[in-house]
Amino acid sequence: SPALDDEHNDNFLRF
């Protein structure tokens, strides 16, 4: 999942 991907964790933290 991109939301949990280290290289794309900005999506997960964008909340």
Curated annotation (Swiss-Prot):
The modification Phenylalanine amide is found at F15. GO terms for biological process: neuropeptide signaling pathway. Keywords: Amidation, Neuropeptide, Secreted. GO terms for cellular component: extracellular region. It is found in: Secreted. FMRFamides and FMRFamide-like peptides are neuropeptides. Belongs to the FARP (FMRF amide related peptide) family. This is Extended FMRFamide-12. It comes from Austrophasma gansbaaiense (Gladiator).
